[in-house]
Amino acid sequence: TTVCLAIPLYEKLVYLKKYPVAIIGGILAGMFACLGGVLVLSMAFGLDHTQYVTLLPKSITTAIGMGLSEELGGMVSVTVASIIVTGLFGNVAAAAIFKLFRIKHPVAIGVSCGTGAHAMGTSRAREFGEIEEAMSGLSIAVCGLLTVVGASIFAMIQF
């Protein structure tokens, strides 16, 4: 899988060099939207701390999300289910969301697919094009690493 994601990225390295601020900014915005959304909804629905930290890794790839959930004291099986549901929703809704918001730039499409819907989003990004696929693959890795740090900080929030 890593090689399959790395080859398109290497071939489209020019886009990474051309749009580094947009790519990192998009990944950070997506990560904070996910973590902030989980925080707000957890407070609104009265979830306890265990349920809250269980949902924090919902927008990263399963391999990273399982370890993060366990480290934060979450319920790993529920985390896996939330990751799958998030990925499925992102995969199914991606085209409609891009059309609704008139998002046409291949880098923006790729970053949002990888950041918001991880591997399932990347499979959808591949249907849009090679640039989208490469940016989505990059976003999976970077978002996963940043979310480990971000979720650890968000997990300290008590409500």
PLM regions: where:
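Short juxtamembrane and helix-loop transition motifs at transmembrane-helix boundaries
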Residues: 10-21, 42-48, 68-75, 99-103, ...
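Entry/N-cap segments of selected transmembrane alpha helices
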Residues: 13-38, 80-89, 139-144
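Alpha-helical transmembrane segments of polytopic integral membrane proteins
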Residues: 3-10, 34, 38, 94, ...
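Transmembrane alpha-helices that form the ion-translocation and gating core
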Residues: 25-65, 86-103
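Hydrophobic transmembrane alpha-helices of secondary-active transporters
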Residues: 1-16, 63
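Alpha-helical membrane segments and immediately flanking helix-loop junctions
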Residues: 51-78, 84-86, 104-142
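Hydrophobic transmembrane alpha-helical segments of multi-pass transport and channel proteins
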Residues: 88-93, 144-149, 153
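Juxtamembrane boundary at the C-terminal end of a transmembrane helix
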Residues: 43, 149-159
